[in-house]
C-alpha cells in the first residue's frame, strides 16, 4: 500500500514536472518568437569605413564580429543621403520626399514626425515591447519651429511617437542647443540659468566663433560652412544660444553618454522584450573623440571617431552577452547616409585620409544621389535564427518597419508604413533577391533595380565645392549599369532608351501614389 502511494506520488510529481517543463519550453519558444530588437544607426559612416566591407586602413573588430555572426549586405540602402529624411523614413516607412518639410532639420525645428503618424516604435509598443530612443535624433521637437519650451517639458517628442524612454541630442553635434534631452526634459538644467535658442539672431554678449577665434580651443571651423556662431565647449556651432551652462555636453563624452545609456537600458529591460534605437554621433562633425581614442587611427579625429563607433558596438554586444540575451536579440547595424570627409571643421580629415576610401567602390557621398550617398553598411545579426553569410539582396531601410511587423506577426494598420514592404526573409538572409527596386532622394530622385539605375533630371548643382562631393545632379537623364560600372562613370541613357523608359515609369508610378 505504502509503495503504491509512493508510486502514485512519484507519478504525480513526474506529471507535474513534465507539465512544468512543457510550460517552460513553451515560454522559451514564445520568447524566441519575440526577440529583442536593436536598430544601431551610425552617422555619416560610409560603406568603405568598416573593415568588414574591405577597409584596409581602419580596423573595426567589433563590427567584424557582428558581421561574422550575421548577414552582411552589399546592396543595402538608406532612403535619403542626409540625416533627417533618412531617419524619418526609417521610423515611419514613408518616403520623406513625399513631403516638403523633411529636409535637414534645424536645432529648433518642430517635430517632423507628427504624433498621429504610426511608427515602428508604436508597432513594437503595441506588441508589448518596452521601447527606447537613445542618441542622435535630428527629427525636431515640439509642434513648430521655435516652439520648444527648453526649460520645461518639451512636447510633442519621442513619447508621442512610440518611445517609452528617450535620451537624445536635440539636433546634431554641430547645431545648438548642445544639451541632452531625457524623457523630453533637458538634463542637468539649472532653473536659475534658463536656455534660450535662436536661429535668427545672436544674443547680446554671447561670443561667436567668427568674432572670437581665440575661444575656439578645440576645433576651428572650415570657411563658409556656417559653423561660426555660438561657442560651446571650445567649438563653434550653427545657431545661437545662451544659458544652460550646467547642461551643456562635452563633445569628448558624447559617445560614452550614448553608450552608457544604451547599456543601462539593456540591463534594465533584459527580462522583457524591448526595441531600442541607438543613433551614434560618430562620425558626424564636430569630431572630438574621447582621449582614449585620440591618435589611435593615424587619420585624425575622423578616423578616431570610427574606432570610437566600433567601441560602442562592442559595448552593446558585451551588454547583451552579460545579460544572457545576445542569442535572442536581433541587431540591425547601418548608417543614416553615406560618408563626408570635410563637413565644416578644420580637423585635417582630408589631409590625413591617405589611401582610405570611406565611400568604398562607389561614387559620391553624403548629399549625393550617386551610390555612395545612400548605399550604406548594413548587418543583421540574430544568433538564434540568422545563419551567418553575405547577401547581395537589394534591401532598403524603409522596409524595416513592415518587416519587423511581419516578425511580430502583426499586420500593419491602415495608413501605417505606406511605402514599407515586408522583406523579412531578405533581412534574415533567406531571400537573396530582396526588393524589385529602390527609390532614393538627394536633390533629385533615383530608382534602381539592382542592375540599372536611373537618375531623374535636376537643376541642382553637380558638385559641392565645400565638401568636395559629386552630387549627381544633371539636367540630363542618367542611366548606369551598376553590375558593370559600379562607379557610375558612363551614362548609358542615350544607348538604352527602353531601360530609361521602364525605370522612369516606375518612378512616375511611385510619385503618383
Where are these regions (language model features)?
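Formylglycine-dependent sulfatase
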Residues: 2-13, 17-478, 486-512
Amino acid at each position: 500500500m505504502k509503495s503504491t502511494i509512493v508510486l502514485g506520488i512519484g507519478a504525480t510529481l513526474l506529471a507535474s514536472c513534465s507539465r512544468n517543463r512543457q510550460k517552460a519550453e513553451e515560454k522559451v519558444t514564445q520568447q524566441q518568437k519575440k526577440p529583442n530588437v536593436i536598430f544601431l544607426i551610425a552617422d555619416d559612416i560610409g560603406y568603405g569605413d568598416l573593415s568588414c566591407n574591405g577597409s584596409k586602413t581602419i580596423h573595426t573588430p567589433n563590427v567584424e564580429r557582428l558581421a561574422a555572426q550575421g548577414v552582411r549586405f552589399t546592396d543595402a540602402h538608406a532612403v535619403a543621403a542626409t540625416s533627417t529624411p533618412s531617419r524619418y523614413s526609417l521610423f515611419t516607412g514613408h518616403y520623406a520626399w513625399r513631403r516638403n518639410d523633411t529636409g535637414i532639420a534645424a536645432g529648433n525645428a518642430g517635430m517632423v514626425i507628427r504624433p498621429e503618424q504610426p511608427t515602428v516604435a508604436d508597432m513594437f509598443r503595441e506588441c508589448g515591447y518596452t521601447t527606447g530612443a537613445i542618441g542622435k535624433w535630428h527629427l525636431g521637437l515640439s509642434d513648430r519651429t521655435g516652439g520648444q519650451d527648453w526649460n520645461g517639458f518639451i512636447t510633442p517628442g519621442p513619447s508621442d511617437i512610440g518611445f517609452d524612454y528617450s535620451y537624445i541630442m536635440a539636433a546634431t553635434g554641430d547645431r545648438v542647443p548642445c544639451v541632452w534631452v531625457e524623457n523630453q526634459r533637458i538634463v542637468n538644467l539649472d532653473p536659475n540659468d534658463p536656455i534660450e535658442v535662436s536661429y535668427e539672431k545672436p544674443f547680446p554678449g554671447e561670443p561667436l566663433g567668427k568674432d572670437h577665434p581665440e575661444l575656439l580651443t578645440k576645433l576651428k571651423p572650415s570657411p563658409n560652412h556656417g559653423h561660426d556662431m555660438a561657442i560651446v565647449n571650445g567649438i563653434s556651432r550653427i545657431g545661437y544660444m545662451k544659458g544652460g551652462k550646467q547642461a551643456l555636453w562635452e563633445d569628448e563624452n558624447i559617445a560614452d553618454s550614448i553608450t552608457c545609456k544604451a547599456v543601462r537600458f539593456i540591463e534594465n529591460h533584459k527580462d522583457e522584450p524591448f526595441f531600442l534605437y541607438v543613433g551614434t554621433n560618430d562620425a558626424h562633425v564636430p569630431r572630438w573623440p574621447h582621449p582614449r581614442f585620440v591618435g589611435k587611427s593615424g587619420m585624425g579625429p575622423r578616423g578616431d571617431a570610427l574606432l570610437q563607433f566600433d567601441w560602442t558596438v562592442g559595448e552593446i554586444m558585451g551588454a547583451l552577452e552579460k545579460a544572457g540575451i545576445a542569442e535572442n536579440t536581433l541587431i540591425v547595424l547601418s548608417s543614416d547616409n553615406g560618408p563626408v570627409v570635410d563637413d565644416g571643421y578644420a580637423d585635417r580629415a582630408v589631409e590625413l585620409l591617405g589611401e582610405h576610401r570611406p565611400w568604398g567602390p562607389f561614387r559620391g557621398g553624403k548629399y549625393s544621389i550617386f551610390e555612395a550617398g545612400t548605399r550604406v553598411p548594413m548587418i543583421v545579426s540574430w544568433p538564434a535564427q540568422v545563419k551567418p553569410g553575405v547577401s547581395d539582396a537589394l534591401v532598403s531601410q524603409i522596409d524595416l518597419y513592415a518587416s519587423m511587423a511581419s516578425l511580430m506577426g502583426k499586420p500593419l494598420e491602415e495608413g501605417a508604413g505606406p511605402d514599407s514592404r515586408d522583406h523579412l526573409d531578405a533581412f534574415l538572409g533567406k531571400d537573396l533577391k530582396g526588393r524589385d527596386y529602390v527609390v532614393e532622394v538627394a536633390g533629385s530622385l533615383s530608382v534602381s533595380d539592382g542592375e540599372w539605375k536611373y537618375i531623374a533630371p535636376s537643376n541642382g548643382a553637380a558638385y559641392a565645392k565645400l565638401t568636395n562631393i559629386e552630387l549627381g545632379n544633371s539636367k540630363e537623364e542618367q542611366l548606369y549599369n551598376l553590375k558593370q560600372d559600379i562607379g557610375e562613370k558612363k551614362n548609358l541613357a542615350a544607348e538604352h532608351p527602353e531601360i530609361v523608359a521602364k525605370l522612369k515609369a516606375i518612378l512616375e508610378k511611385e510619385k503618383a501614389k
